[in-house]
Amino acid sequence: MGALTIVAKYMIVAQIEVNGSVDKSDIIGALFSQTEGLLGKDMDLRELQMMGRIGRIEVDIFEKNSKTKAKIYIPSNLDRYETALVAALIESIERVGPYLANIKVLEIKDLREEKRRRIIEKAKELVKMIEEEILPDTKEIIEKLKEDVAKAEIVEYGPEKLPAGPDVEKSDSVIIVEGRADVVNLVKHGYRNVIAIEGISRGIPQTVIDLSKKKSVTVFIDGDKGGELVLRELLKVAHIDYIARAPPGKEVEQLTAKEIAKALRNKVTLEEWLAQQKAAGEKTEAPAQPTQQQPPPAEAPIQFPFDMSKKVEEMLGTLEAEIYDANWGLVKKLPVRELPDFLTGEGDSFYAIVMDGIVTQRIVDLAAKKGVKVIVTARVGPLTKVPEDMKIITFEKLTQKVA
């Protein structure tokens, strides 16, 4: 069907069969000539076409042998009654040239309905485009705005000028992460008491170590081996209260607000984390085991001047430490949290420490400098080096040995 020459409301579709071989022009000529004057001048096809009431008549011949079959398309700008009258008019055609003919109207299409359908379909496409293209762009703009605001709030903290959130100084707790991008992501989502160590290649910054002495500390690590390495280094020198971890394979800087909230909500204490590692086969501690040489210290005979099993019962749950001299005289009793500071201070050397806490690499290093030879403890954290002349034994192994 060719292009319409008017803005039509309706389309008359008819089929014609001619008992002979004819052309398009023959069929169109028959339509005009055989309907002329039948319904008066106002309904004459030629007059209607000249006034733009009907459009260009199209004929598509689809069979032409001894008989000719074709479809006729007549666009109409008349109202529905007049259009129906024109349709009935063309059915009155009986001949095309010398051949008998028969015309049957197949349908009268409401082109406005077709147009409405196309408009609706187009509207659906546009809505889909809005959802897929415009809305994501809006979200991206909002995320970019949040990130820019977060970056503007990042401060440089301490002599090392570590990237940190604006509330690190005044908050009672602090979240330690690895890098600046992690800080930006957490600040963007409302966590303003966060500070980064900026990697572990140059060691843990003293600023972070000092913060860990006076604030509740949560270490938020990536969900990969790199995160475990960061935690291992922190445990050597800093006081760690809680550990939060990103989902496996994800980094803290990549997390959404929901993922951050879930990870921090599911944080565990250091004791719980160590127990989980032990239950999982102590995978993160396995590489350090050969250098710890813990079995020999645990099995080596240690002479105590008092019933150590009773002492263990007394200390369980107190989170305290007791410092002894070479004659097993009590020098100091203090909370385990204050033990590193006490060992750092100036003073005489000591012989033994009994503590209801976790022995970290930092405690081992400080105790070694004070000449400590025996440490009796509730738990042993990840250690990389223990002096050969230092004996470390856990409450559990001690009670088993006594039993």
UniProtKB/Swiss-Prot annotation:
MF-aspect GO terms: DNA-directed RNA polymerase activity; metal ion binding; poly(A) binding
Enzyme Commission designation: 2.7.7.101
Residues the entry annotates as binding Mg(2+) 1: 178, 222
Start and end residues of each stretch annotated as Disordered: 279-300
Annotated residues for binding of Mg(2+) 2: 222, 224
Catalysed reaction equations from the record: ssDNA + n NTP = ssDNA/pppN(pN)n-1 hybrid + (n-1) diphosphate
Gene3D superfamilies the record matches: 3.40.1360.10
Toprim domain location: 172-248
Any one of the GO BP annotations: DNA replication, synthesis of primer
Domain of life where this protein originates: Archaea
Protein role: RNA polymerase that catalyzes the synthesis of short RNA molecules used as primers for DNA polymerase during DNA replication. Also part of the exosome, which is a complex involved in RNA degradation. Acts as a poly(A)-binding protein that enhances the interaction between heteromeric, adenine-rich transcripts and the exosome.
Protein name: DNA primase DnaG
Lineage: Archaea, Thermoproteota, Thermoprotei, Thermoproteales, Thermoproteaceae
Gene, per the UniProt record: dnaG
